């Protein structure tokens, strides 16, 4: 059986670490992970088991470093694009920069190796920006969420547009969960019609892997959400603060550097 290699971009984030944990459960000699991060010591502190495994190669540097990202995604089965933020950063470009660099890297690989297999790109997005998936969210709450994460959502929308503009040669899957929580894995189901809060990052990661490994192409080019099968994840206590600080960053972007970093926990 050929070695299956997966690239995880954003390895120090909650989704990135959950993807690595899922892929390493259990470790397999037939699977390898290329983990991109900006800070290798931070990743090793989050996942100290990586010090003792040969299944993971860490790529450290800037997401706009074309040669680094090219090396990270070459000969992979799937690339997980999870570089984003829980903070409503003014002018956020994290997802756009990730997608742009990956697309440029794939073009270089195809030029050098015309017969190279292009990996599936799995983008972490949000149900909030999908009219169909968010249709059952409370009408009073949806605009609050869209405002509290306005800069992040604008970044995601543009990143999705970039991927869809290249769908003639790149297969992308758009994973759109609702609220996320740092919690245990309970079981998941991929869904085209429903969203649910809260989903654990471990269940989200398992869902992303399932979509990436599907050989029938049922998720290719689709917006896909995730629902629980074994009960909801716990309510993240950091959520109210995340929303309030996100609203402040939206209405008063000049306060950004004075405001705390937030996110579910």
UniProtKB/Swiss-Prot annotation:
InterPro entries in UniProt: NAD(P)-bd_dom (IPR016040), NAD(P)-bd_dom_sf (IPR036291)
Disulfide bonds: none
Protein's pathway: Secondary metabolite biosynthesis
Domain of life the protein comes from: Eukaryota
Gene3D superfamilies: NAD(P)-binding Rossmann-like Domain
GO aspect biological process, one term: monodictyphenone biosynthetic process
Disruption phenotype: Impairs the production of monodictyphenone, but still enables the synthesis of intermediates until emodin. Results in major accumulation of chrysophanol and its 6-hydroxymethyl shunt product aloe-emodin.
Keyword field contains DNA repair: no
Oxidoreductase as UniProt keyword: yes
Transmembrane regions: none
Catalytic class of the enzyme: oxidoreductase
UniProt-listed Enzyme Commission number(s): 1.-.-.-
GO molecular function: monooxygenase activity
Pfam families: NAD_binding_10
Family: Belongs to the avfA family.
UniProt protein name: Oxidoreductase mdpK
Gene source species: Emericella nidulans (strain FGSC A4 / ATCC 38163 / CBS 112.46 / NRRL 194 / M139) (Aspergillus nidulans)
Lineage, opening ranks: Eukaryota, Fungi, Dikarya, Ascomycota, Pezizomycotina
Gene name tied to this protein: mdpK
